[in-house]
Structures are given as C-alpha cells and as structure tokens.
Amino acid sequence: MSDTVRVELGARAYDVEIGAGLIASAGARIAPLLSRPKVWIVTEETVAALHMDALRAGLDAANIASEALVLPPGEATKSWPHLQRIADWLLSERVERADIVIAFGGGVIGDLAGFAAAIHRRGIRFVQIPTSLLAQVDSSVGGKTGINAPQGKNLIGAFHQPSLVLADIDVLGTLMPRDFLAGYGEVAKYGMLGDAPFFEWLEANGPAMAKGDPALRQEAVRRSVQMKADIVARDETEQGDRALLNLGHTFCHALEAATGYSDRLLHGEGVAIGCALAFELSARLGLCSQEDPSRVRAHLAAMGTRRDLSDIPGDLPDADALITLMGQDKKVVAGQLRFILARGIGHAFVTADVPTDAVKALLTDALAGR
C-alpha cells in the first residue's frame, strides 16, 4: 500500500508517491502525463546496473519507449561538463517541450537532470524517481535543481518543480549501509527543525528502520516528505520558512567544499555533523539547553552515522578557512551569513545575529577534538 503526499503549488502541484514496487508500475503512473509514448531517462552507472531493467520493464508494460543517458556516479558529476552532456543529448534526441525526462538516481542525478529539464527549450517537464534515502526525503521534492561550482555547492541552478515523484521503498534495500545512514541525516533533520514528536519516533524506531523494516522506512519517508511539502507550499523559493530546511547545511556545505566534494564526506553525513554543530552553537549562545545537542549526538551515535569533525578522515582547514567557505553559502544576504539555530529540538529558526567569534570558537574546539 503506497502513500501519496501532495505538494500544493497551484497549477504546478504534484504528487509524491511513496511505497513498494513503484518502479515496476512506473509506466502506468507516468503514462497520463505523456503527450507521446516515449521518455528520456538520465541515470548513473550504479543505479543503471541495479534498477534499469526493472524501470524499463515497467515502462514496456505501459507501451512506453525509452532512451537513456548513463553518467558516472558521484558528486563530481554535478558539474558543467555533465550538464552540457545532458543538454547536447536532449537536443540530439529531439526532445520536445511537451516531452518528459526521468531523473532516475540519487540527489546528484535529480539535481542535474532537473536543471537540464529547466533549461532545455526554456523548460520541459520531468519526473523524479529517487533511488537513495536522501533523495527520497529531500532533494527530489521541492524543485531545487542545479550544479556545483568551484566556489561552492549548488550555486548555479533553478527552481523547477517535477510533475511527479515516485519514491520506491524497495530500492533502499540495495543501498550500502553508509549511503543509507547518510540519507538518514536528512530524515533526522526534519525532527530537529520542526517536529519533536517525529524525533522521538526516530529515537524509538530509527535502529529498526536502518536494519530494513519496510513499514518503518515508508513511514519515515512519508513524514519527512509531508513536512517538506508543507514548507515548500508556504515558501517555494526560500524567502522565509523554507530556509529552515537548511538546518546543518551552512556547516555542511563548508565541510563538503573543504573535502573537495569527495567520498571523504557524503552530503547527508555533512548534514548530520552540521546539525550537531548547529545545536552545539545554539546551546553555547544560550538558546537551548546543553541537553539538546547531547541528545542529538546520542541519537546519531545510536544510528551509527557520523556526527563530529573527528569522523571525517584526512586533513581539514582551520576554523578561519572554514568560516571563509561558509561565506559562499546561498543563505548569505547583504554580505551577512544566516544560520539556522534552535531553541530546542523541533524549534529551529533563521538568524543573522551570530557572533563570528562564537562560530570560530565552536569550530576550533571541534577541530581540536580530531
């Protein structure tokens, strides 16, 4: 039994379907959107090897033809050269404005293929079929698309909403444990930023979910997507509440840049570490009790995910250099860096009133613990 979360955006509203077996039935679910019985799939090598046959079988069952472009896996793919490769491919395939592209992969593919759809012929529709936990609960929903720049993450892109999202819970069983736990950083973030009862639910059910319980996985994805859908409906282009979804990301993006967007630090791992740092900073500023960052770290430890700078292998820059990297964050307004801090678990807020000295002291202490 699948769940459906509606992202209410007027004429551009769409459904996020969550459940088992959705790839096998993808053709029937996508068919009503098509102007002609053909789709163009953008994916990556790992996903193609694991799941392309199932997707093609699902499309064939609905008499939908398909072409596919298979890219290398990894964060480095979210770049100008691969965006140009997709753009050239869509043009060579004569993809029309009424056609649909399928983004079939994790967050990298969703962001990249979505951006290509946004700029091809000034915008065509696309469907997200996210294959990682991180993509299912976060990046596939809300219309943020884009690529990384040498100066920072996600600095080039567009808001372009999908027409449909199919989150197949079955594919989560094929993830490596590290990839699943990286995505879990985004799940826990939702509880931390605005839903204390959900965080309590995760404390009770997270370990069993990580071990593979499908019902718990579906419920965790549903609750995460529902929270994101509600926030996106209120603030699609991040002028207000949507910035709350960046809890942990100011630290995370600096750490990702410092590690060269490599597998030294996966995005969801950076989010988990960033959330722990944000709560620690909040406690130091007297905004929440010290019990809150301790509880956050205890839960991340119970899940076995990364939670401290000491969990990142290799060298890191000093505190000043990390703060400089934070200055490239998209949340900078009038030259001022905005942080998402918390008055407690489930009570995040956005502020620019953060002393740089406090951030430097926090990072200096965290680096000293490595």
UniProtKB/Swiss-Prot annotation:
Enzyme class, broadest EC rank: lyase
Protein residues bound to NAD(+): 107-111, 131-132, 144, 153
GO molecular function terms listed in the Swiss-Prot or TrEMBL record: 3-dehydroquinate synthase activity; metal ion binding; nucleotide binding
Cofactor note: Binds 1 divalent metal cation per subunit. Can use either Co(2+) or Zn(2+).
Any GO CC annotation of this UniProt entry: cytoplasm
Residues holding Zn(2+): 186, 249, 267
Highest taxon, organism lineage: Bacteria
Keywords attached to this entry: Amino-acid biosynthesis, Aromatic amino acid biosynthesis, Cobalt, Cytoplasm, Lyase, Metal-binding, NAD, Nucleotide-binding, Zinc
Subcellular location(s) per record: Cytoplasm
Keyword Transcription regulation: no
Main location: cytoplasm
A Pfam family matched in the record: DHQ_synthase
Enzyme Commission number: 4.2.3.4
Known cofactor(s): Co(2+); Zn(2+); NAD(+)
Keyword set includes Hydrolase: no
Catalysed reaction, written as an equation: 7-phospho-2-dehydro-3-deoxy-D-arabino-heptonate = 3-dehydroquinate + phosphate
GO BP annotations, alphabetical order: amino acid biosynthetic process; aromatic amino acid family biosynthetic process; chorismate biosynthetic process
Pathway participation: Metabolic intermediate biosynthesis; chorismate biosynthesis; chorismate from D-erythrose 4-phosphate and phosphoenolpyruvate: step 2/7
SUPFAM superfamilies (UniProt xref): Dehydroquinate synthase-like (SSF56796)
HAMAP family: DHQ_synthase
Entry similarity comment: Belongs to the sugar phosphate cyclases superfamily. Dehydroquinate synthase family.
Function: Catalyzes the conversion of 3-deoxy-D-arabino-heptulosonate 7-phosphate (DAHP) to dehydroquinate (DHQ).
Protein name, as recorded: 3-dehydroquinate synthase
